[in-house]
Amino acid sequence: MNPFASLTLTTLIILTIPIMMSNSNIYKTNLYPNYVKTTVSYAFTLSLVPLLMFMHTGQEMIISNWHWMTLQTVELSLSFKMDYFSVMFIPVALFVTWSIMEFSMWYMHSDPFINRFFKYLVLFLITMMILVTANNLFQLFIGWEGVGIMSFLLIGWWHGRTDANTAALQAILYNRIGDIGFVLSMAWFLTHSNAWDLQQIFMLNNECPNMPLIGLLLAAAGKSAQFGLHPWLPSAMEGPTPVSALLHSSTMVVAGVFLLIRFYPLMETNKLVQTMTLCLGAITTLFTALCAITQNDIKKIVAFSTSSQLGLMMVTIGINQPHLAFLHICMHAFFKAMLFMCSGSIIHSLNDEQDIRKMGGLYKAMPFTTTALIIGSLALTGMPYLTGFYSKDLIIEAVNMSYTNAWALLMTLIATSLTAAYSTRIIFFAFLGKPRFPPLVLINENNPLLINSIKRLLIGSIFAGFIISNNIPPMTVPNTTMPLYMKMTALIVTIMGFMLALELNNTTYYLKFKYPSQTYKFSNMLGYYPSIMHRLPTYHNLSMSQKSASSLLDLIWLETILPKTTSFIQMKMSIMVSNQKGLIKLYFLSFLITIMISMTLFNYHE
């Protein structure tokens, strides 16, 4: 086995050491979180070597060394696919997770079960690594289900809270809907291709029909929270902030997009599925950006921004640019994790206050967090020469040059503008103006665990885009020719969003309270989607069940059919066989009339 394969496998095996140490004495002490964090940092350092080797040689590799089982004619083996996507993604995921774990040591320091929390985080990372490196559908499905169950455990970490339990159940149920599509696609490929290895599937299905690809699209929509299966993502904010940062930056939510990127050789020849992906992504990115504008929970605003960026990635796949979508996944991980960690820093300092209306004036008390959040927001909006610019600007250019669907283009541009608007809103409400929180709150951001973790991602949010985009294939990008206004589209719509948000904030700062309009309610209530989908079907099902139980069983069978029907039949039968009606007065009168008539007749003959 060459060094490339050996070092890659070593990186993956190192991550399992903290899990295996669960039975040791280290797990029972306070040193375990630090041990896990150090292990992940070593794994990251080691993963850079295969990345550099891949960048130098450009050779992909499949490691297949352990036979699992044989199902009739399908042979399943433990195989790892070390290609452009997996070799690039592993260091990014490890770097971000390393920072999040250091942040967790500060954020979760008072939790009595912090060791178990770190074990869950490592398991979450391992399952994501399995998903990314899998070379067959069965192994990919193990990683897919692994991130699902670990997200359930981590979102519901504070299981004493009803909202946390509800959010965890909601996440797992929406993902179950997506899993139906995944299992359907697996069954189709097994039936028609007799293979689950990715190379065999791509060779045997040059022109893939719609059914398996639509199944994969459904799976991606569930995992990446696309429109229709999106409500679980903002609800997942009930979990601890490190979970939100890990879930929404480099792991679970990008798994759906990553699945479609893996299957791009089949999708690029299927125009119907590409169009569906494009439209779904455009609707998601616009709808979630609209919802983010009126939210007041700082974590939910960042969560909706994640959903909006996932929609943008789906749009990119829809215009047949999977490598560009993957580049955006890598860039997005840095600043999105940092935005969540800055939110966590604010929430922790303000005694778990998440409402941006109860913040304000924090730029003096928390200068480092303010700087990091502003740079993260600028990177999110695609400000030139920050990390987000190197992928987002290319995506907008590619969408502009595409002639596929003008409506999808327009929706994407509006969502890009709204990204700047809600980012400005967070900055304006949380950091500027006068303080709107109690004066006795102790604010301290000088913990080295917090500072170092955010600082690392801050450097990544500034320089990672330049470093990655200049060192990955293709090394030489051909010069594109396009009009200046088209090249500047992304920047223009972003600046328009900033100006609109500043104008709105300045205008509304001194206004009196006005009753919310229907448009505001539509955005604030997330388009009424959760209310309708979570309440109406369940209410109607329960009421129908109740009515069928009470009306069908109790009212009809136990009351109408047996007692009432029996008594009614008996009454009818008694009426039929009886001559007497119980009319006493009429009976006496008939007797009297009969006597009078008979006496009259007898007297007449005399």
Curated annotation (Swiss-Prot):
The EC number(s) this enzyme carries: 7.1.1.2
Enzyme class per UniProt: translocase
Transmembrane segments: 1-21, 43-63, 87-107, 112-132, 137-157, 171-191, 213-233, 241-261, 273-293, 301-321, 324-344, 366-386, 407-429, 457-477, 482-502, 582-602
Catalytic reaction list: a ubiquinone + NADH + 5 H(+)(in) = a ubiquinol + NAD(+) + 4 H(+)(out)
GO MF term list: NADH dehydrogenase (ubiquinone) activity
Disulfide bonds: none
GO cellular component: mitochondrial inner membrane; respiratory chain complex I
Any single biological process term in GO: mitochondrial respiratory chain complex I assembly
Official protein name in the record: NADH-ubiquinone oxidoreductase chain 5
The organism's taxonomic lineage, starting at the top: Eukaryota, Metazoa, Chordata, Craniata, Vertebrata
Gene name per UniProt: MT-ND5
